[in-house]
From Swiss-Prot:
It comes from the Bacteria. The gene is rplM. The keyword Signal does not apply. One of its GO terms (cellular component) is cytosolic large ribosomal subunit. Keywords: Ribonucleoprotein, Ribosomal protein. The lineage of its organism: Bacteria, Bacillati, Bacillota, Bacillota incertae sedis, Caldicellulosiruptorales. NCBIfam families: rplM_bact. One of its GO terms (biological process) is translation. Part of the 50S ribosomal subunit. This is Large ribosomal subunit protein uL13. Belongs to the universal ribosomal protein uL13 family. Disulfide bonds: none annotated. It holds the Pfam family Ribosomal_L13. It comes from Caldicellulosiruptor saccharolyticus (strain ATCC 43494 / DSM 8903 / Tp8T 6331). GO terms for molecular function: mRNA binding; structural constituent of ribosome.
């Protein structure tokens, strides 16, 4: 018996809606990363995009446990000497809650060419509304 290798056009893509209300950021991001990669499907192939689309609503209601709101955060470098910047999660969630979820999911995806393709399939919105009703997304409970 030969090993099955999926081709990108033969794996059907589904749309899922996830409500982030009261969900811990890390656990939510881990589940989203699995769905984006397609690891929940029997046709999973590591070098092929077999994942589904994910819509996250109510991004501003995601929670962090413990003291992570002030202690942890998003770190980046401006490429100038002494240009290391740090934004605590408290400030990031106040101003750009959708960015916090995108950063967490991006860190849980493989660091290769497919990561940008996976990230294009992630749609994060503040509030309960989203413009993807035409795709008839399934509600996914996490």
């Amino acid at each position: 018996m030969k090993t099955y290798l999926a081709k990108p056009n033969e794996v059907p893509k589904k749309w899922y809606v996830i409500d982030a209300t009261g969900k811990p950021l890390g656990r939510l991001a881990a589940k989203i990363a699995v769905i984006l990669r397609g690891k929940h499907k029997p046709q999973f192939t590591p070098n092929v995009d077999t994942g589904d689309y994910v819509i996250v609503v109510n991004a501003e209601k995601v929670v962090l446990t413990g003291k992570k709101l002030d202690k942890d955060g998003y770190r980046y470098h401006t490429k100038y000497p002494g240009g290391l910047k740090f934004i605590p999660y408290r400030r990031l969630l106040e101003k750009h809650p959708e960015k916090a979820i995108e950063i967490a999911v991006r860190g849980m995806l493989p660091k290769n060419r497919l990561r940008d393709r996976f990230m294009r399939k992630l749609k994060v919105y503040r509030g309960p509304n989203h413009p993807h009703a035409a795709q008839k997304p399934e509600v996914l409970e996490i």
